[in-house]
C-alpha cells in the first residue's frame, strides 16, 4: 500500500481509557470485557480504572483476562488514553463531570452521553481546549446507525427493569 492511500487500520499503540463512572448511582460501564477483546484484536490497547466494571457486575479479573490493563489512579487513565469512554460525561454529569474536565487535554477524544444542550458551557470549554467530543445520544436514529443507538437500547433495558422490579 502506498503512503498516499488511507488505511482502515488504527494507528499503532492507540489507547482507549475507561474511568469509573462518577454520576450518582450509575451502574453501567462504558466497555464490557467482551468488547475489550474486540478492541485488542483490532490493535487498540485498553486501560480501565480498577473497579470501573464492578457496579455493572464485571470483575477486574474479567477485564484483565480480556487483555485490558487495570489502573488504580483515575488521573492516569486520562493521561495515558487518547480516547476516553464514559457512560455519562461532561454535561450529562453536572455534579461530578467537571472533575474530569481539567483532566482532558488537547487532541483527546471523549465518547459518551454528554448532554451537549444542557451542558453547552462544558462542551464549549472542551472544544476550545481542542477536545473532540462524541455525544452518543445525538447519533441519528436511522437503520444504518441502529447498532449505536444508545437511547433506544437503554430505554428498552430500563423498561424491562421497571416491569421486573
Please state what every model-predicted region is.
Residues 47-70:
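N-terminal beta-loop-helix "entrance" segment that forms/cooperates
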Residues 67-80:
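Short acidic low-complexity segments
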Residues 2-15, 21, 92, 96-165:
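Glycine/serine-rich phosphate-binding loop and adjoining beta1-alpha1 elements at the start
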Residues 44, 68, 131:
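Short phosphate-binding/catalytic loops that engage adenosine nucleotides
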Residues 3-4, 9-50:
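N-terminal phosphate-binding or glycine-rich loops at protein starts, especially the Walker A/P-loop
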Residues 82, 88-89, 114-115:
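Short glycine-/small-residue-rich Rossmann-like dinucleotide-binding loops
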Residues 81-82, 108:
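Conserved acidic residues
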Amino acid at each position: 500500500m502506498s503512503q498516499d492511500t488511507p488505511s482502515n487500520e488504527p494507528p499503532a499503540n492507540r489507547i482507549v481509557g475507561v474511568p469509573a463512572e462518577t454520576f450518582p448511582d450509575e451502574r453501567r460501564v462504558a466497555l464490557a470485557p467482551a468488547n475489550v477483546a474486540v478492541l485488542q484484536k483490532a490493535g487498540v490497547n485498553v486501560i480501565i480504572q480498577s473497579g470501573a466494571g464492578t457496579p455493572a457486575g464485571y470483575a477486574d479479573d474479567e477485564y484483565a483476562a480480556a487483555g485490558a490493563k487495570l489502573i488504580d489512579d483515575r488521573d492516569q487513565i486520562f493521561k495515558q488514553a487518547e480516547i476516553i469512554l464514559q457512560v455519562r460525561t461532561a454535561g450529562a454529569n453536572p455534579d461530578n463531570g467537571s472533575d474530569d474536565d481539567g483532566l482532558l487535554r488537547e487532541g483527546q477524544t471523549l465518547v459518551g452521553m454528554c448532554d451537549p444542550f444542557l451542558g453547552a458551557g462544558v462542551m464549549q470549554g472542551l472544544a476550545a481546549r481542542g477536545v473532540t467530543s462524541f455525544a452518543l445520544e445525538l447519533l441519528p436514529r436511522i437503520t444504518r446507525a441502529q447498532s449505536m443507538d444508545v437511547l433506544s437500547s437503554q430505554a428498552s433495558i430500563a423498561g424491562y427493569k421497571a416491569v421486573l422490579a
